[in-house]
A protein has these predicted regions:
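Short, cationic low-complexity segments
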Residues: 188-190
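Polybasic, proline/glycine-rich intrinsically disordered low-complexity segments
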Residues: 182-186
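Short hydrophobic/aromatic beta-strand micro-patches
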Residues: 169-171
Length: 200
């Protein structure tokens, strides 16, 4: 099965362009779930700082080939980061590593720092594990209509197909009502969404 969300993400970027100094963080990741020989940890193949849809389109073939070659997935953060914030976070993270004598951790310094940075446009990711459109629309209506803030009835910014369902990307909302209505659905506050994966 193929999941190819390049066009969807590029259209989103065109309608929500990055400001000067902002970027979307993209990683190609080998997961141990699909590659049991990796052991307990996932493996990052390559990372990209994506500032616009043109950059993503330019690297589309490269990303697709790497994913197929390594049986990996391409994930992209819809929330934007800034180079300035990441730069300061790199200094803080490096100081932390050095004080703990964790010199080995320095090789992951930039990606760790990006992950720790607050986004300039925070989003939630609602992980739906079904392709049933009626259920997905029910979840979207619950978020938009029945979850605070009530003055914003367009909290859902993007619905991204995944291998077994959808990632509903939203603006922040009060999780209590949704959690009570759908206790088995996971909501993540700093997670990327699936850009590309070709199942072997």
């Amino acid at each position: 099965m193929l999941v190819n969300n390049f066009q969807l993400i590029e259209e989103y970027m065109d309608s929500h362009p990055c400001k000067e100094g902002e970027f979307h963080f993209l990683q190609i990741i080998q997961r141990n779930k699909e590659n049991p020989n990796l052991g307990s940890n996932n493996h990052v193949i390559r990372e990209y700082m994506v500032e616009n849809s043109e950059y993503l389109e330019k690297h589309k073939n490269e990303i697709s080939i790497l994913c197929q070659l390594f049986n990996a997935r391409a994930y992209i953060h819809i929330s934007k980061k800034t180079y300035k914030d990441v730069g300061f976070q790199v200094l803080n993270t490096l100081a932390e590593y050095l004080s703990q004598e964790n010199y080995h951790g320095a090789k992951h310094l930039y990606s760790t720092s990006v992950g720790r940075c607050k986004s300039s446009d925070k989003t939630f990711l609602v992980d739906i594990d079904t392709k049933e459109k009626e259920f997905v629309n029910e979840c979207i209506n619950c978020i938009n209509i029945y979850c605070q803030p009530f003055d914003n009835i367009n909290k859902v910014v993007l619905t991204v197909p995944t291998l077994h369902g959808y990632h509903i990307i939203t603006k922040p909302f009060d999780l209590r009502h949704f959690g009570e209505s759908y206790p088995n659905i996971d909501i993540h506050k700093n997670n990327p969404t699936l850009l590309y994966y070709k199942e072997k």
